[in-house]
Amino acid sequence: MAAVYGIQLVNKLNTATVRRTYLPNRYDILIDRLTNHTQHNVLHRALDFNATTREATVVQLYPPLNAWTPSSATNVTDYTYLEWVDFIQERSTTFSEVLRQRYPITTYANRFVNPLVVGAAFSDFLNADDISVYLEHLFYDPRVESPVQAILSFPYQWTPRFHVFQEFIRTGAGCKYARSSRDMTPPTPARLPRYGKHRPAYATVFYYNTLAARSTILAGISAGPTALEHFDSPTYGPHIILPQAGDVLGYHSRPVSQADLLMTESVMDCLRENSQASASTAVARLDQTYHPVANFDPTNEDSMMSRLTNLALLVVQGAQAELAIPTVPTNDDVRGFVARLMSEGQRQRWFPYRTDRVLIHPDSPFVLPPGDFYAAYRVANFPFTSGTYTSVPNATKPLRVLPQYRAATILPAQATQAYEDHVIAPININHGYCISGGVYFTADDISIDPTPFPARDLAQLPQNYFDPNRMARRELLRRLRVPSDRSYLKDNAVFTFLASLVNPATALPALQPGFSLAYLGASAAHAKSDEPTILADLRNGSIPGLPIPSRIAQFGYDVVHGSLLDLTRAVPTGTFGLVYADLDQVEDAGTDLPAANRAALAMLGTTLQMCTAGGVAVLKVNFPTVEFWTQLFNQYATFATTLHVVKPIVVNSSEVFVVMSGRQSAGNLTCTTSLQRALLAMYARNAAIDQTMTHVPMLGQADDGTSALGMEAIRLFDPLFVEGNPNAATSALATLMANVVPSSIHMSRLPVNGPVSTTIFGKRTFLSTRRRDRLLEYPLPMVTAINHQRRFTAPPSFSIYPTEPVNVTTLVAAGYNAYVHTVITSAQPAHLFDLGTGPECRILSLVPQNTRVTMVDSRPCAELMQAYDPNTTAYEQADYTLAAFWNGRQCDAVSAIFTLGAAAASNAVTIDALLANLLPSIANAGTTRLWLQVNAPLAGPTPIPGLIDIDTRAGTYTFNNGERTEPYIDPQVMQATVLAHFPNATLSWYTLPPTCEWLDYIIGAGSSLDLSTIPTALQYSQLTPILSIDTNVAPLRVNPIPTPLGQQCAIRIPTNDPAAVLDAKHRGVPVITGTPAALTSLMGNAALQYIQANNEFLLQLTPTLAGIFDVTLTSAGQPPIPRGSFTITAPPPTAAVTMPANIDYTDAGNDGPIACDPYYNLAVCIMRNGQYVRVNPEKARVETVAAGRALHFVLDLADNHVLMYLCDVTPAAIGAIIAHPLADIYQLVFPNNTPLRASLPYIGGGARVELNNQPYLSLTNPPPVLPAGTALAALATAASVGQPTYTLPAGAYRYVLE
């Protein structure tokens, strides 16, 4: 088949053969066009009108509107489509009125209007300019003269934009397209092209009437852009078009001039019309293409204009493209056309270029018009015949390509040159969604912390919070979250927290059955409801452990089922047990922080005013500034018993929910270090997520390859990928595979009228860039699998984020990747050994390119090592657990991530036994820094169902429901094992911090995230931590060990710098910071002094916070140096209940003393849908008594079928540490000589009671008349609130589940 470079042509010629006769425009017809607003597509047509949104972005203009050249004073780009239509209709109607005032239609209806004059007049009228000169020459007689001749009779400058000379007319080309405010971003593949013809005066037009005048025009434009001309039936008369100088972006990786675009549009139009042409249909012109007539070099075959002209000379013959040209092409279609035209290929120039003439083959169906611009020209061996052609349809989906390499490389410069010839740039990317799922929820109890903290010193809202770039990144993240009811997600998280809220004085739930609810800020703006979506869950009891409210009242600005109120003012309402204020201060204050503070405090006052004594008040605060907290504690410290700050993280905002429980007038709330820790954590997390979003390109921004995160693609036509000496296709592919993440590579194959367009694309991230920068040469890929493909696919989908979020294991691995990069970059080891690397050589994308690294794994390497510098990069296929491997090895750093557990399992040894054999070899190699990930339960062996099951007897973890089993090691044993071989080492434990700095390696690396999986990932990390070992610095020493909570301890940190700054972090948040002269502690009383005699710091601390704390020292001008970790142990997480000697089976209940450290808040729960849910407090509850705490419970026959637990309750979870089964109650044998009670076991469960093995009472469907002696109990003591209880006379009952 013939081709002009990448434009494949079929061997059939087809054109229309009948030209439509031009009919002059009558005056009455013009008036109809201007005033007929009911008929569509008269003056304009929306090419992409959306019937749902009533919007359009690209509008094609028709005469006389297409003569409009908008002036700078006429700015309509801010209009929506409908606003633009209104504007045009109003102005066109007014224009017609102006015309009719001058020329009444009854008199002038059958006169012919000059289309050039009408267009110019309408343009100036829309620009609010004077049009009187045009009205003088509105009419002409087409029987006597042409529109151009009529105007040339009056040679002078009519207006600044319309100049009539003796021989020709000069005017600006009117816009042929308009765009709305919805299309202000750079072009994207799905958008429609405008070919630059939306720009005012995109070209200058010279109308002439004689060849002499044409020569004069050409002489005057002999320098500048390429001039173009329609030879066949030019509109209104012969004219030459001189496009604007400069380039139009968005159509090709290289600059495209305005002339190129006009020529491109004309060629595409002609190709489309050729494919649709029929002898039965007359057309305005047979040859739609332009012809360059000045400032054009046909010999420059690399220029776009030269190639377009070459193609146009074939298209005018009737040539058809194998790939169909859509009726309304998209940017993607135009870019693809241009890319194919500018790709490698043969020019196949069948017809020579003539400046003033187009040569036509005698066998072409094209009918030559009169005149000298077309001439016959016979070509030898012309491979075309007349006929039509039907294009081949596309197929299904792109194919994933996993790169494999052969033992050959290519120099980057050589490969990149080929890549640049085939790269698609810029790419109009589809972001997809990076955030999905529920919320990441945090909660902090402010009032439980005994250590006060000055409110004025609290962490302040970051000064750059309202920086435009930071606001843009927050908005970008919001838009990249899967569409959902964000208000519902937040409400659900907060109400779930409220279900676990406890009155500290009584140990009873803060919200008792029958509480009333006032929802402030209730909005009707929800997709499927005209009230807050959470209210449906509250009414049907769907929030686990939360009683159903007795009534719900709604208030706010946008309420439907309630009352309109300004909630910054006093309100005329009653009081409620729970006042929930989902109020936005930005509604009234915007980003004015002082105004927002005042609004928040006024709303808090209203919320508390509406709250009944003992109730709970909740307020959403958009900007929790120091000023807000200061006034909260100044004005409202006496209004509640407890204060919590909860944060449901849906997007990256600073808003928090303030929960004030136990409403009273004599409270004593104080600002504590707990609040400071919560704010520091939140702002650190905000900053981390903001940093992550710096990698992500803005929406609507075409990917030009400069952003850290994006897509790269090459497109080739009928590529021949070779295994021998690399050709251009193979070289370009090698560059692409070097640039992108290997696992992200896909290929798309599309038929292009015989030849195939092959697009290979992948995701570019900062990780792939690190790997590429380490390459000395680019490895050449094996192309067997690619060459084997004969399937066609769907077009490529340049989507950054996949639809499925990463799983928890991948989330943890990504977090550890971030840690490895940080510590290796900081430590700058001379030679790193990475153990258990894996065939994909992940470490190469984590460490700096100049770090010497040796990777060790028993599996063969999937990378081509000869492409790397052997002095910095090596791969050893070996078993690193063997002592023989280490003979003669030298390294100063070792990393082993997610490998030691598997190695121990494969060798059938424990981890400590494995390390006992491995660590001596590592020490002998000269290693001073180690980072060892191990299976070690730092917070105790608490399993994660479905992810990590723990067998404490066998000492093993089972991952992913049996996928693999590995041993685990006690953290203390791990430390002792390490210190046995590195006795002076500093040891630090690393787990994922909730401040989320590691999200860079998820969102910033192009992976999707389910926010609700973050807590699980943090828990997973607690079971699989990394131990950092540093023999270069002396370790800290702690006394006593273990170090219990609340007991003073001494921590000694060796250092020669008495001016060093000490930092101790807990879960990523600094809790101790400073020097001996100025020390701040957020974890209890602390004092720091420098002991000169011992060259050490002495930190004396009475801790109020349990956990693992990482200590660093920072000397002036130096990076922080880790000095180890110390652990503050919480009281033993044990609980026991002593059953009373005499059991009471009435509703008076029983009390059993509880033995459990008061550090733990307790509640009685049952398991429901995999989580612990509080039971009905009338059934069982924890009460505070003089001797401590007691379990109060009322017995029920259902107790033998529903196991209750005594669980710890924290703001974040229930039963995470203590879940003590109340087996004595579950196993109780009920007597037959005393009245008993019976209830349903749980919501949704059915049961019946049998007496003497005979049916007695159905609890599922109780009869209208109860058996004798049986009654509905006044006090319902079922495990679930709202279910009835029945009293039964003495008897031998059997309780049966249904």
Swiss-Prot record:
Lineage: superkingdom: Viruses
Methyltransferase listed as a keyword: yes
UniProt keyword annotations, A-Z: ATP-binding, Capsid protein, GTP-binding, Methyltransferase, mRNA capping, mRNA processing, Multifunctional enzyme, Nucleotide-binding, Outer capsid protein, S-adenosyl-L-methionine, Transferase, Virion
Annotated catalysed reactions: a 5'-end diphospho-ribonucleoside in mRNA + GTP + H(+) = a 5'-end (5'-triphosphoguanosine)-ribonucleoside in mRNA + diphosphate; a 5'-end (5'-triphosphoguanosine)-ribonucleoside in mRNA + S-adenosyl-L-methionine = a 5'-end (N(7)-methyl 5'-triphosphoguanosine)-ribonucleoside in mRNA + S-adenosyl-L-homocysteine
One Pfam family in the UniProt entry: Reovirus_L2_7th
Cellular component terms (Gene Ontology): viral outer capsid
Species assigned in the record: Aquareovirus G (isolate American grass carp/USA/PB01-155/-) (AQRV-G)
Transmembrane regions listed in the UniProt entry: none
Protein function: Outer capsid protein involved in mRNA capping. Catalyzes the last 3 enzymatic activities for formation of the 5' cap structure on the viral plus-strand transcripts, namely the RNA guanylyltransferase, RNA-7N- and RNA-2'O-methyltransferase activities.
Main localization of the protein described in the UniProt heading: virion
Protein name as it appears in the record: Outer capsid protein VP1
Cellular compartment(s): Virion
Disulfide bonds: none
Family, similarity comment: Belongs to the aquareoviridae outer capsid VP1 protein family.
GO molecular function: ATP binding; GTP binding; mRNA 5'-cap (guanine-N7-)-methyltransferase activity; mRNA guanylyltransferase activity
Parts forming coiled coils: none
The protein's Enzyme Commission number: 2.7.7.50, 2.1.1.56
